[in-house]
């Protein structure tokens, strides 16, 4: 066993003292993931992947299985917590230049894609009204991609419509994809540990390192307990806050809900998809909205790693965060004049961030050279 792994094993990994609470979200993601696997297991035990029985089995879990309501709400709200944590985790990586650890960043982005796929399969498994319509829409969008994709969609979901085979495939795929995501997470963690984390101040912090245990373990535990508190309070008092009222009726392929909107964590990608009138273009933009994260390590031009001392980049970063929220909000609205325009402008600004990133770095380098 290499020396470094040995250190990690005993929690003696040297870590910079100045990494802030933004670095705690990785451990929270691990906790979310473990909880999703556990609750998902107990739900899957009682779930029936049949088009006629899926909805009834969900109702049965909620009403008849001991603590089934708790498992279901923990699983549903845990997914939302998971996505909140992962979005913060990515934003922190963007802000502090963590993406310059290319291996870690690329494995993490693949993880994000896998996670979104898994969450989608999980949502489709319930066979409720909103879920069925969303599944149909996603299948249609996937089929739009290319000539080959139609065959692939048919192979995966068995038909264009959500049929019994689709529910079975989605239930199995949610379980399989979660296991694959756990494996990829291990790879990401190993890659992250091998190259040490970026210090926030972007200076070399070798002289100022402390052991991970007990200092950062307790710091992680604090944020973790806060997250668990939020989770349990949400599950107890507002279990349906992230839910769609349409999900309380059984899926009916003949009746389309008035506003088909996915879970909140997909709204951002969905808003970008919707802002483009062309079907193929929308599907491409949807893929690009996530894939563009892969380009960030290769377009970093600034001589400074972190955004902490880069005011222009800070402005752009917070604009990006605001844009993300605006797209998420606009995607919940119907497709009508003001909202379509807002979506289009916000999507343009979102993509502009990644194009402006190298240009701003170049400008800042020139400014610093002159002084």
Swiss-Prot record:
The chain crosses the membrane at residues 25-45, 69-90, 105-125, 170-190, 218-238, 280-300, 312-332, 339-358. Pfam families: Cytochrom_B_C, Cytochrome_B. It is a multi-pass membrane protein. Binds 2 heme b groups non-covalently. CDD domains: cytochrome_b_C (cd00290). GO terms for cellular component: mitochondrial inner membrane. GO terms for biological process: mitochondrial electron transport, ubiquinol to cytochrome c. Heme b b566 binds at residues 89, 188. PROSITE patterns: CYTB_CTER (PS51003), CYTB_NTER (PS51002). SUPFAM superfamilies: a domain/subunit of cytochrome bc1 complex (Ubiquinol-cytochrome c reductase) (SSF81648), Transmembrane di-heme cytochromes (SSF81342). Keywords: Electron transport, Heme, Iron, Membrane, Metal-binding, Mitochondrion, Mitochondrion inner membrane, Respiratory chain, Transmembrane, Transmembrane helix, Transport, Ubiquinone. GO terms for molecular function: metal ion binding; ubiquinol-cytochrome-c reductase activity. It comes from the Eukaryota. Heme b b562 binds at residues 75, 174. It is found in: Mitochondrion inner membrane. Its cofactor is heme b. The keyword Heme applies. Signal peptide: none annotated. The cytochrome bc1 complex contains 3 respiratory subunits (MT-CYB, CYC1 and UQCRFS1), 2 core proteins (UQCRC1 and UQCRC2) and probably 6 low-molecular weight proteins. Component of the ubiquinol-cytochrome c reductase complex (complex III or cytochrome b-c1 complex) that is part of the mitochondrial respiratory chain. The b-c1 complex mediates electron transfer from ubiquinol to cytochrome c. Contributes to the generation of a proton gradient across the mitochondrial membrane that is then used for ATP synthesis. Belongs to the cytochrome b family. Heme 1 (or BL or b562) is low-potential and absorbs at about 562 nm, and heme 2 (or BH or b566) is high-potential and absorbs at about 566 nm. PANTHER family: CYTOCHROME B. This is Cytochrome b.
